Amino acid sequence: TKVWRDHFKDGDLQASVRDSLNRLKTDYVDLLLLHWPVPEVPLIETMQAMNAVVDSGQVKHIGVSNFTVDLMDEARAHSKAPLAVNQVEYHPFLDQSAVLNACRSAGMAMTAYSPIGQGKVFEDDVIKQIASKHGVSPAQIALRWLVDQDSVVAIPRSSSEAHIESNFKISEIKLSEEDTGRIDALRSPKGRLIDPDWAPDWDK
């Protein structure tokens, strides 16, 4: 579960966790993420609150979402508990090399949300060609490309049983080095699709 931006203060964060546990009818959650960085609240205060809910047994693991490399480093420096993950936008059109390398160095996973680029994979000629060659969908190619990368986890939306089954079938796809290289070449720092007003100063 995630802590939204308006609950990053000490006390507010713990209350948010209690509310989540009550809604989920459980005593603890396996993973708690900070949804977006909030410059108005000192990160040390937020991380101390995150550690408090770990110490209380309400949360097993903590992580962040939409954090830049510098913010990841700051969060780790202020946390006794290790950070498990940084959940960020990642798909074949966005270069997230800086964050991914930082996650690997820190022993963290990088979870890719919006892994099919809000449907852009269905319009891209390179991905469509590779999908046709393998006899699968462009979405399956994008997911295979993501999970082939060390430390990357993809979280596709699954609105139907057919989508869930399709996602599982990516284990049967084997991308060649040429396939991977062609998809790698699509990545760009300018490929970001999700950039709200409160977003941080992204890594270049």
Question: Which residues fall in each region the model found?
Answer:
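Active-site mouth loops of central-metabolism enzymes
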Residues: 1-11
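Ser/Thr-centric signal marking residues that sit
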Residues: 1, 26, 46
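CE4/NodB-like, metal-dependent polysaccharide N-deacetylase domain
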Residues: 13-33, 52-56, 78, 108
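Beta/alpha (TIM)-barrel catalytic core signal, keyed to glycine-rich beta->alpha loops juxtaposed to Asp/Glu
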Residues: 5, 37-204
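Acidic active-site catalytic centers that drive phospho-/nucleotidyl reactions
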Residues: 2, 30, 63
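Short, conserved acidic/polar surface loops in the N-terminal third of protein domains
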Residues: 9-14, 43-45
